[in-house]
UniProtKB/Swiss-Prot annotation:
Pfam families given in the database record: Glycos_transf_4 (PF00953), MraY_sig1 (PF10555)
Reaction catalyzed: UDP-N-acetyl-alpha-D-muramoyl-L-alanyl-gamma-D-glutamyl-meso-2,6-diaminopimeloyl-D-alanyl-D-alanine + di-trans,octa-cis-undecaprenyl phosphate = di-trans,octa-cis-undecaprenyl diphospho-N-acetyl-alpha-D-muramoyl-L-alanyl-D-glutamyl-meso-2,6-diaminopimeloyl-D-alanyl-D-alanine + UMP
This protein's name: Phospho-N-acetylmuramoyl-pentapeptide-transferase
Species of origin: Gloeothece citriformis (strain PCC 7424) (Cyanothece sp. (strain PCC 7424))
Membrane topology: Multi-pass membrane protein
Keywords: Cell cycle, Cell division, Cell inner membrane, Cell membrane, Cell shape, Cell wall biogenesis/degradation, Magnesium, Membrane, Metal-binding, Peptidoglycan synthesis, Transferase, Transmembrane, Transmembrane helix
Keyword Cell inner membrane: yes
CC cofactor: Mg(2+)
Amino acid sequence: METKLFSSASLIKPSGTSLLILLTVVLFLLMTLFQWLLTSSLEGIYAVILPVSVSAIACGLLGFGVIPLLRWLKTGQFVREDGPQSHLKKAGTPTMGGIFFIPVAVGVALIGSKFDPQVVAVGIVTLAYMMIGWVDDWQVLRQKSNKGISPKMKLLLQIAVAVLFCLWMLWTGSPNITNLSLPGNLIIPLGWLFWILAIFVLVAESNATNITDGVDGLASGTCAIAFLGLAAIVAPTSVGLMIFCACLSGGCLGFVLHNRNPAKVFMGDTGSLALGGALAAVGLLSGNLWGLFIISGIFFVESLSVIAQVSYYKATKGPDGQGKRLLKMAPLHHHLELSGWSETQIVGVFYLINAGLAILGFISR
C-alpha cells in the first residue's frame, strides 16, 4: 500500500480570494510586529505601510488594463504536458505579467527613496533580470513550446548581470563588504571568495524564485512576505533599501490580485527572475546574507527538491536507463499536488511558513 505523504484530509481548501485576504492580513501583522520590535512603538509605521500600499494599489490597478492587452497580444502560457494534468486547463492564460508590476514597483521605490544610489543599483539589477526573463518568455511564445532560450545562454546572462553588480559593489562599497555576518556577532572575512559567493547567490536566488513559480499565487505571495521581512532587516541601516523592499512587497501583493487562483495572468520568467535577483541584490548590498538565507527558505527548499530528484534519479539509474524518484514530481509543490493537496492548500501553508521564516530571519539578523 502506497504511503500518502502530506495527506490533505484534514486541511481546508481556501479560495483564491481567501488567500489574497490572508496574505494582506499577514503582511499587515508583520509590518506591525516589525515596527514594534524595531522601535517599541507603532509610531512611524506609515514609513513602511505607505510604500507597500502605493505600490500594491498602482500594480493592482494597472493589471486591469495590461492583462487584456497581454491576452490581445496572444501571450498565452504553454503548459508542459509532463506536468500535473490539472495544469493543462491553464494553457492560454496570459504570461509575462512581470512586465507591468516589476517596473511599477521599482519606479515607486526610486521616487520614494529620492533616487538613492543603492536603490538605483538594485533597481537596475532587478530590471536586468526582468529583461532576461522577458527574452526567455518571448522565445517560448515565438516557438510555441515550453522551451525558451537555452539554459546555458540564460545562465551566462544571469552571471553577466551578477558580475557587473559585483564590480559596482567593489567600486563603491565599504572595505568591510566582503565580511560575512552571522548570528552571535560572528564575522567571517571572506576576501575574494565573497565575490564568488555573491555571483552564486544572485544566480541561485533568481532561479529559486523561478522554480517556485508553479502554482497560482505561490511565488508572488511568498515573495511579498520575503521582501517585507528583508525590509525590516535592512531598515536600521538603509532607509532606501527598506523602501525598495516595501515597494516590491506591495508590487507582489498587487499582482496576487490577478494571480490568485484561478490566475488571470502569470508573471512568467519576466517576473520570477526579477524578484529573485532583487532579493539577492538587497541581501548582498546590505550585508545581510544570513537573513536572506532564512527568509528565502521556501525558495531554497523548492530548488533542493529539484536537485535531489535529479541526483537520485541519476544515481539509481539501472541497465534499462530508468531510475527511481524521491518525489512524485519535482519541485516540491508538484509533489504535494500529486499527493492530494489542492493548489490553494499549498499556497496557504507556504504563506504561513514564509511568515514564520520572515520573523525568524528578522530575529536572527
